[in-house]
Amino acid sequence: MFKAFILTLAYVALRAESLPQMRMSPSEVRGSALDGSQVGSSGLAGVHTKVLFGDPSKAGFYSILLFVPAHTTIQAHSHHDDRMATVVSGIWSFGYGDHFDANNLKLLPPGSVYSEPGGTAHNHFARTGNDSVVVHICGFGPTDTRYFNPADEPKPAK
């Protein structure tokens, strides 16, 4: 399950200037501060990120964990940078296109990998089922999130 996660991290770490030593068990990761408004996240309420390395808003390598609650749909969007992702837990339903299309979703169980090509018209979308999902994402910032349809952009909480 974590083999793909480790291979992804090893690949991108080779391009990083200085990767610090870090060891965190799942309970330590979940117990540390999570941010719902992190750059490069969907911006949806309930979706949280944990930055493992770097700063997604700045130039350079970054690594984040994305925590997505059950029954969440993320509409078609893209990111400025190329990103590689590994499903850590849960079943992630993922697809490419300029609008959400349930017929274009592929079920990705833990250990699955996928790409998020940046700077192109290759938008992507996702959905969770009855369980929450954790995804590990690596990229070279700065990153952003641009929704294909501006009406799908999450609105700030009032």
Predicted regions and their residues:
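Extracellular/periplasmic catalytic domains that process cell-envelope and extracellular macromolecules
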Residues: 42-45, 56-58, 78-79, 86, ...
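A short, N-terminal "cap"/entry segment at the start of jelly-roll beta-barrel domains
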Residues: 14-62, 150-158
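Ligand-binding loop in jelly-roll beta-barrel domains
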Residues: 109, 119-143
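Short beta-strand His + acidic residue motifs that chelate non-heme Fe in jelly-roll/DSBH
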Residues: 74-76, 94-95, 116, 121-129
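Conserved short histidine dyad/triad with adjacent acidic residue
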Residues: 59-79, 107-108, 117-119
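Short acidic-glycine-tyrosine-enriched beta hairpin
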Residues: 92, 98-120
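Sec-dependent signal peptide recognition
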Residues: 1-7
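Glycine- and acidic-residue-biased ligand/ion/polar-headgroup-sensing regions
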Residues: 69-72, 78-99
